[in-house]
Amino acid sequence: MAQKQNVGASAFPYATHLNVLFQQLQEIDVPALASKVEDRWYNQTLCKVNESVVRLGVMQGEYHWHKHEDDDEFFFCLDGNFIVDLEDRSVILGPLHGFTVPRGVVHRTRAPERCVILMIENAGIVPTGD
């Protein structure tokens, strides 16, 4: 297992956009949005659903080790392969596979090649972890 780092997101080249792009009753064309992304690690809030948000991730590379003390985090792979590393194992998600990381669990995510995912999490979650 790779060594864990406890570093803030400012040290990483992540493009994280917390503004909500779509309101209720608006169609969301995820493939069109993903096709325009040029960043290697992109995270955009698409919409709000009750007290949660749906975020689009277009990623290649790896995120730092982190945890969310108060919130679960759900990942759903749309295209490519997305890996969720836990302290004791790694979970590889292919297209149309999902996985929930419970609150308080140390994890990191990575994608050896470009992948497209959706994330569902509490609207108040700190994307970089606690």
PLM regions with names:
Residues 58-59, 68-85, 120:
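Short, conserved beta-strand element in jelly-roll/cupin
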Residues 87-103:
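Short acidic-glycine-tyrosine-enriched beta hairpin
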